From Swiss-Prot:
Quaternary structure (record): Heterodimer of AddA and AddB/RexB.
Annotated protein name in UniProt: ATP-dependent helicase/nuclease subunit A
Gene: addA
Residues annotated as domain UvrD-like helicase C-terminal: 476-786
UniProt organism field: Staphylococcus aureus (strain MW2)
EC number: 3.1.-.-, 5.6.2.4
Catalytic activity: Couples ATP hydrolysis with the unwinding of duplex DNA by translocating in the 3'-5' direction; ATP + H2O = ADP + phosphate + H(+)
Family stated for the protein in its record: Belongs to the helicase family. AddA subfamily.
Length: 1217
């Protein structure tokens, strides 16, 4: 059927119009992010009903989630109602309003369930089945695996013994059980699981497949070997330009000869590669060489870096791909074949027994849905059944949303109920393979890719492909920068998608022309001497600062009205790969009193209230578990004190269990009577609850515990009470859900909880935040898919990819099967096998590809502006990223495959065109102006040092109360209002005096003026600082733990306070003797010597400043002072708004009648890229100018003489003021 001509003035683009009306063949719509695919899908359904006269219940619409299905059905229903109102006489539309309720707009699982319910007789199952919960299903599967393994232990087949030797430890079969479970899930994602398992052994037995694996490895290794050879040649070219490096060139020439032999004839000579040593050690670069090439220092470093890169690449090939010769790899495969075959047999036994258990309990899981549906729709030979033919006749079109996330079983089901072949079929598929991020759910993006490559734009002879590329969500800056990144990051080799003109995003939203560049923020961590925060905590704090900046300066554009409004909390989302940073972010936002919500499925079992209830349940089930019993005793419910627990244990120190100690204490005549009564009540409770649990389900036991001890009421009254209450009710509801499963009893419930905790399947904190609540949200990229936000902060870019699965002894892959390491049972040594090496390499490639697609999803969530947050230890690492090698239009394949994290790639791509220091052969273009508008990046790259990020605004917000809250409470009470107004209007006559403390230190004054210069209210900062603890560090920590930076600073000042000044300077031996003397005199601790920076003190002793002081007429150390601030600040006479300044000057000396003061500084500082000593000196002077000015003015006030000063930095040197 031809596509109708598009009228003038319609809202649809040409591609959308084609997507709505294309028919007569299978259609694949590649719908980029924000391209309106859902609107197109709904419109296509409506036009099928309105234009083609098709009944809505004769369309099968498959969505990815139940929520999507409900929303789509609602949209279709609304459109039908609108059309019916416009044409009330239309009988067809009236019928659709009735049939919409039977319309098959659902997930594929829901369709399969309906199929099973209608045709259960074909399956010979009880029609009264129910669906098992995920937790129940896992428990039953675990139980089945345990039983099957026990059966095979009874048989003790030699292959089974070898398997257990390899995959089990001395302590448990946990790893073995995990591998069996993974194999089960992989197998059932195939149309014929048994057949898939049977084929696992084929590569281990057939040489033809082994040869294919050798070729696969050869092709992969060629990428790295070629890159290694390029790096080696660059190193040679650079060294060739230098003097006195003949030995270096000789080593490189030998390596070039070896590499030339490996690559001879354009093929990789594997035997030569494995039979020779590569990467000889390069001679050291001596001072003589540096002197001879003093004008080429950067080139010298680059040459060394290139040779290091060569060694790294060749080492990867030899360690990861060809650690042994190919013949040895093949020989191992033959010996592994019986083990692989037996492992497949175990999984088939598990599958059979698991299915039997499910039938006996009359339960089905989602895998059963798919396989039973397939059983109904196919004959024994795999051809469509009569039932399938009837569905083919019934459904006039099948529409599939999110097609990139389907698996092979689902594809087979769809193929059974669709009509025709690709060139004349009725299957309409919508998706975006660039957003395929569910491989862990066995989604198979290759299904989409294969069709995309096979279908054509005009649909001649095959299916039709339509590209929806126009984006109606984001500003052009987001789109063009995203295009630029992926143009250089994604292709068929890494990412599995060619990011060409058809794949890229095109601007289609009606925003105004204001500039909204993407912001790439690179946070350089402060070391421990500058911050007590970890790197992750620093990043969390920095993210909060970005949020505050957005709220203060950014606005949101309303496309309907063409006007702006201020940004609010709910306009901002923080996206991360996982929830690992959630706790740090929660704390950082809490510190700033910014409403924040983590849309997390993690952390539930760590909540205090949940841990209490679980401790209670575990103690009731088995009171001999000390951790849970004592935890319950120490809780708010029973409130035993630590000294009481100590009394109990001291009386019976050798008891195995604390419960025994309690019983023994109660029976001891010397026991404290009050404590005995308390213990008797506690044990009585335990016994009472134990008896109750025998006759009642778990949820009733929990309910009784809640009511007996007012648990709900107590936790509701705490901070976050609403969420705590929801968590407690959530656990209660989970217990009800558990009782509805096939398992019963307290023990089984605890096992159920343990299984969830072990597998990381958290319930998640109960969600008490709605979609319209005004909070900043954090969510994972996976959970953000399909959503959009005005401002997206994509953080955690520097967190490494999780490659833990690649280190397992068994690697699984849907396409290739199972790769098992070879384990020599006699020698008890493991080696990579041909299959494990090949499949591990494939798995790594697929993993990095999916991580790149996750980056695409994250970037395309932003509407107004995108913030990318990366974090590095130091700025030197950025130079290496700028110089990542390229190949054509992309970052080189080897660089992408070995990239540790997203930041590695994103920064490299975006920084290349902005860097003036890298050569043209490492840039994608000589001039960014040459790049087309649609992919020309608009990005601001900022390198921020954490010590420059103000932490002064982290305040204790509990000190502030809202007057509005008080007025709201007394609303309507005029007397109260008048009294409040009278008190608030009162003007204290000495208000200025309240704003300053009566006594201040110079350091405090320094912070005050620095804060005022930054525009912050110092009064709030000062109130926060008053709360700091001043307790000394405990002695046991001082002796055993590592000293903090401030403690080392104090120690260094103590040493300097007593340091002798001698004209002939003291020697290093004398310095050690002096330190030992301080220890003998107990001036410093005995273990302090290891923390004293001797080299820095010796540098001071050899400095000019030391010599000047040694020749001074008078020297005063640690001189305290107290002075009127009015005199120091030279305030007018009579000004009463003054304070007393107190302080301590490290050292004062008099030379030639002039007074000088010296202030020692142990600060560390970052020597940032390109900074000279002069610039560092200026920076350090500016940092302490206020403090030094006060010292100078104070001394001049006291002495009534001109005073000069020095700053001495142990890590920099002398600065004269």
């Amino acid at each position: 059927m031809t596509i109708p001509e598009k009228p003038q003035g319609v809202i649809w683009t040409d591609a959308q119009w084609q997507s709505i009306y294309a028919t007569g063949q299978d259609v694949l719509v590649a719908a980029a992010a924000g391209s309106g695919k859902t609107a197109v899908l709904v419109e296509r359904i409506i036009q099928k009903i309105l234009r083609d006269g098709i009944d809505v219940d004769r369309l099968l619409v498959v969505t990815f989630t139940n929520l999507s299905a409900r929303e789509m059905k609602h949209r279709v229903d609304q459109r039908i109602q609108e059309a019916s109102i416009a044409d009330p006489a239309n009988a067809h539309l009236k019928n659709q309003r009735i049939k919409i309720h039977q319309a098959q707009i659902s997930t594929l699982h829901s369709f399969c369930l309906k199929l099973i319910q209608q045709h259960y007789d074909v399956l010979n199952i009880d029609p009264n089945f129910r669906t098992s919960s995920e937790a129940e299903n896992i428990l039953l599967l675990e139980q089945t695996i345990d039983e099957v393994i026990e059966q095979h232990y009874d048989i003790l087949d030699p292959a089974f013994i070898e398997l257990t030797e390899q995959l089990s430890s001395d302590r448990s079969d946990d790893q073995f059980r995990m591998i069996i479970k993974q194999l089960y899930f992989f197998s059932v994602a195939n149309p014929n699981p048994t057949n898939w398992l049977d084929q696992l052994v084929t590569p281990y037995e057939e040489e033809a497949q082994q040869a294919q694996l050798i070729q696969l490895l050869t092709d992969l290794s060629k990428v790295f070997i070629t890159a290694a050879y390029d790096a080696l040649n660059k190193a040679y070219d650079l060294f060739s330009m230098m003097d006195s490096v003949d030995k270096h060139l000789a080593v490189i020439e030998d390596e070039r000869r070896l590499m030339g032999r490996v690559l001879e004839g354009g093929f990789i000579d594997i035997p030569y590669l494995t039979g020779h040593e590569f990467g000889a050690r390069l001679p050291n670069v001596t001072a003589k060489i540096k002197e001879a090439n003093e004008m080429m220092v950067d080139a010298l470093e680059d040459a060394k870096l290139q040779y290091k890169k060569y060694k790294s690449l060749i080492d990867k090939v030899k360690s990861d791909y060809f650690s042994r010769e190919a013949d040895d790899l093949k020989a191992d495969m033959q010996q592994l074949a019986p083990r692989v075959k037996y492992l497949a047999r175990i999984v088939k036994d598990v599958m059979s027994e698991f299915n039997r258990k499910k039938r006996s309990k009359n339960i089905l899981d989602f895998s059963d849905y798919e396989h039973f549906a397939l059983q109904i729709l196919t004959n024994e030979d795999g051809s469509p059944s009569e039932i399938a033919e009837s569905y083919r006749q019934h459904f006039q079109e099948i529409l599939v949303d999110e097609y990139q996330d389907t698996n092979r079983v689902q594809e087979k089901i769809l193929s059974c109920i669709k009509t025709g072949d690709e060139h004349n079929g009725n299957l309409f598929m919508v998706g975006d393979v660039k957003q395929s991020i569910y491989k862990f759910r066995q989604a198979d993006p290759s299904l989409f890719i294969e069709k995309y490559q096979r279908f054509t734009i005009d649909g001649d002879g095959t299916g039709r492909r339509i590209d929806l590329s126009q984006n109606f969500r984001s500003r052009k800056e987001v789109l063009s920068t995203t295009n630029y990144i992926f143009k250089h990051m994604m292709d068929e080799q890494v990412g599995e998608v060619k990011y060409d003109e058809a794949a890229q995003l095109y601007y289609g939203a009606p925003y105004d022309e204001s500039d909204h560049p993407v912001n790439l923020k690179v946070l350089v961590e402060a070391d421990q001497e500058h911050s007590d925060l970890t790197g992750s905590e620093q990043e969390a704090h920095f993210i909060v600062e970005q949020v505050k900046d957005i709220l203060e300066h950014q606005k949101v554009y309303d496309m309907k009205t063409g006007s702006y409004r201020s940004a609010t909390y709910k306009d901002i989302v923080i996206l991360e790969r996982s929830f690992g940073q959630a706790r740090n972010l929660q704390q950082a936002f809490k510190n700033e009193d910014i409403p924040f919500h983590v849309n997390s499925r993690e952390g539930y079992f760590e909540q205090t209230e949940v841990r209490l209830v679980l401790s209670f349940l575990r103690a009731i089930d088995n009171p001999l578990q000390d951790i849970y019993l004592v935890g319950l005793m120490r809780s708010v419910i029973y409130q035993f004190k630590e000294d009481e627990l100590a009394q109990i244990r001291i009386l019976s120190p050798n008891d195995d269990y604390f419960y025994q100690s309690i019983v023994n204490y109660i029976n001891d005549e010397a026991a404290d009577a009050i404590l005995v009564d308390k213990l008797k009540m506690f044990l009585s409770d335990i016994q009472s609850y134990q008896q109750y649990s025998k006759d009642h389900p778990v949820y009733q036991l929990i309910d009784k515990f809640y009511n007996d001890h007012y648990v709900i009421q107590y936790f509701s009254g705490l901070i976050g009470g609403r969420g705590r209450r929801a968590n407690l009710y959530g656990l209660f509801n989970k217990a009800i859900e558990f009782e509805n499963s096939s398992f019963r009893g307290l023990y089984q419930f605890i096992r159920f909880i343990d299984e969830l905790i072990e597998r990381g399947k958290d319930f998640g904190e109960e969600n008490v935040v709605g979609p319209n609540d005004n909070v900043v949200r954090m969510m994972t990229i996976h959970s953000s898919k399909g959503l959009e936000f005005p401002f997206v902060i994509y953080s955690g870019l520097s967190k490494d990819f999780n490659k833990r699965d690649l280190k397992q002894p068994v690697i699984l892959n849907q396409q290739f099967g199972l790769g098992m390491d070879y384990f020599d049972v006699d020698k008890e040594m493991a080696f990579p096998s041909l299959a494990s090496v090949a499949y591990r390499a494939v798995a790594e490639k697929e993993l990095v590809s999916e991580e790149i697609r996750l980056v695409y999803v994250a970037l395309t969530r932003a509407k107004e502006q995108l913030y990318l947050i990366g974090r590095v230890k130091n700025d030197k690492s950025l130079l290496e990223l700028e110089q990542l090698s390229i190949s054509g239009e992309h970052i080189a394949v080897n660089e992408r495959l070995t990239s540790p994290n997203p930041f590695h790639l994103i920064y490299s791509i975006l920084s290349k065109h902005q860097s003036a220091s890298i050569p043209d052969d490492l840039k994608f273009e000589k001039d960014i102006a040459q790049v087309e508008d649609s992919s020309r990046p608009n990005v601001n790259i900022s390198i921020i040092y954490f010590e420059d990020v103000s932490t002064e605004t982290i305040l204790d917000n509990n000190e502030y109360r809202s007057v509005n809250q008080l007025e709201t409470m007394q609303n309507g009470n005029e007397d109260v209002k008048a009294q409040i107004k009278h008190q608030l209007d009162y003007q204290y006559p000495y208000v200025n005096d309240t704003k300053k403390p009566s006594k201040q230190s110079v350091s405090e004054l320094k912070r005050q003026y620095e804060t005022e210069e930054s525009g912050t209210s110092y009064e709030r900062v000062r109130q926060y600082r008053i709360g700091f603890s001043t307790y000394e560090r405990p002695k046991f920590l001082s002796e055993q733990g590592k000293r903090k930076a401030n403690e080392i600073g104090t120690l260094m000042h103590t040493v300097m306070q007593h340091l002798p000044f001698k004209k002939e300077r003291i020697s290093e031996v004398e310095l050690h003797q002096y330190i030992d003397g301080l220890i003998d005199k107990h001036i410093i601790e005995a273990d302090a010597k290891k923390d004293i920076r001797m080299d820095e003190i010796m540098t001071f002793i050899n400095s000019e400043l030391y010599s000047i002081i040694a020749e001074a007429e008078q020297v005063y150390r640690e001189l305290p002072f107290v002075v009127n601030q009015a005199l120091v600040d030279q305030l007018p006479q009579g000004d009463e708004d003054v304070s007393i300044i107190q302080g301590m000057i490290d050292l004062i000396f008099v030379k030639d009648g002039v007074h000088y003061f010296v202030d020692y500084k142990t600060d560390a500082f970052n020597r940032r890229r390109g900074m000279t000593d002069e610039e560092i000196g200026t920076q350090l002077k500016n940092k302490y100018k206020i403090q030094m000015k006060y010292y100078q003015n104070t001394l001049q006030t006291i002495l009534n003489k001109e005073v000069k000063g020095y700053l001495y930095f142990f890590k920099f040197g002398t600065l004269q003021l």
